[in-house]
Structure formats: C-alpha cells, structure tokens
Amino acid sequence: KIFERCELARTLKNLGLAGYKGVSLANWVCLAKWESNYNTRATNYNPGSKSTDYGIFQINSRYWCNDGKTPRAVNACHISCSALLQDDITQAVACAKRVVSDPNGIRAWVAWRAHCENRDVSQYVRNCGV
C-alpha cells in the first residue's frame, strides 16, 4: 500500500506515534517519506551486512525482524520481516516504537538524519487536520 501523506499522518497518530519518545508526528511522516516514499511494500538489500530493510520505515533484518536469511539476526521486535510489509502498519509501528526506544532514538534512521534532522518538518503534516 502506498499511503497518501495525510492518510499516513492520521494513521500514525491513531497508532500512538505522535510525540512517542519525544518524536513529533511530523518527524515520523518525514522519516517514512524518505525511507520508503510512504510504501509499505518497500524492501532494500544491504550487501555489506547481507541484511534487508523492510516496509514503510525500512526496518532492518539484522537487528529488528526475522527474514530467515540474515546472518546473526537479533530479531529484537520478535516479528517476521514480512509482517512489516502488510497494508496494515500496526506491527510496523510497534516495531518502530521498539527501535526508537533504544539510546539512538530516531537517529537510528539514516534517512531521518539526512533529510529531517534540524529541518522544518511541519510541511509533512500541513493541512492534515492532525
């Protein structure tokens, strides 16, 4: 599923991400824009670590989910990576909450550091009624 910007903002708010661990809703929408272009089915393989990033938040199989093929995988979210590709993003959001609970917080995501950090992210929720 490819979310429309405001549809995603409303969904993330309903799933409790607004202000979670101090991260604003606009920052989460910015993250999703630059990681997956709002696409729940997005996958990207990382040859160096032989790991894959999954879903709207591009959550990595080395640490967070199990895809059955990543060496030394940790599976800290206790989830199948395929669950992160569903149209229903409830499980992806739950895992993102686990990721952002680590000391690195939202900085765990390279795309957030590159495109959202220290920027005006208000545009990502503008006119969304959230």
UniProtKB/Swiss-Prot annotation:
Active site as annotated: E35, D53
GO biological process terms, semicolon-separated: defense response to Gram-negative bacterium; defense response to Gram-positive bacterium; killing of cells of another organism
Keywords: Antimicrobial, Bacteriolytic enzyme, Disulfide bond, Glycosidase, Hydrolase
UniProt EC number: 3.2.1.17
Disulfide bonds, paired cysteine numbers: C6-C128, C30-C116, C65-C81, C77-C95
Any one Pfam family match given in the protein's UniProt record, by short name: Lys
EC class name: hydrolase
Record-linked InterPro entries: Glyco_hydro_22 (IPR001916), Glyco_hydro_22_CS (IPR019799), Glyco_hydro_22_lys (IPR000974), Lysozyme-like_dom_sf (IPR023346)
Ranges that cross the membrane: none
PANTHER family, per the entry: LYSOZYME C
Subunit structure: Monomer.
Name of this chain's protein: Lysozyme C, spleen isozyme
Organism the protein comes from: Canis lupus familiaris (Dog)
